[in-house]
A protein has these predicted regions:
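Glycine-rich phosphate/diphosphate-binding loop of Rossmann-like nucleotide-binding domains
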Residues: 1-18, 22
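Short, ordered loop/turn segments at secondary-structure junctions
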Residues: 21-24, 46-47, 82-86
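Glycine-rich phosphate-binding loop
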Residues: 29-66
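Phosphate-binding/catalytic loops
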Residues: 85-102
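A charged, well-structured terminal subsegment
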Residues: 99-123
Length: 123
């Protein structure tokens, strides 16, 4: 995810910084703490469903918080967080070698680039 996201952003000469979090639940607060330092964010991660409702709660609250931050602070945030039912799905969606699915990291970076290119404040 990260390598393909970086590759996509660098292809457009975007200056990047990588900030790691312990898990996806910590992504929104990390973005909020850094919201004034960057023009945009690409959130990357992976959650694989287990046997409890924890998966649904974590994913739902994280995705909602990311969207709320994007709207509140008028900042594009590409969501490259993979939600998968099993490891096979996670690997397919991550763009690993042999995967036939598109890479979610590159897709999230592309989404951010599209928003930045159409930013009316830059016109």
């Amino acid at each position: 995810l990260l390598q393909n996201s970086i590759k996509k952003l660098k292809s457009k000469k975007i200056k990047i910084s990588v900030i790691n979090t312990p898990g996806i639940f910590e992504i929104p607060i990390t973005i909020k703490m850094n919201i004034k330092k960057f023009d945009a964010f690409v959130a990357l991660g992976c959650v694989i469903k287990g046997d409890t409702p924890h998966f649904n709660l974590i994913c739902s609250s994280t995705f909602d918080a990311i969207m709320q931050l994007s709207i509140k602070f008028d900042k594009p945030i590409g969501n490259g967080i993979i939600t998968a039912l099993n490891m096979r799905q996670a690997v397919e969606r991550s763009g690993k070698i042999g995967s036939v699915k598109p890479n979610k990291g590159a897709e999230a970076a592309h989404a951010v680039l599209s928003i930045l290119e159409n930013d009316p404040k830059k016109i």
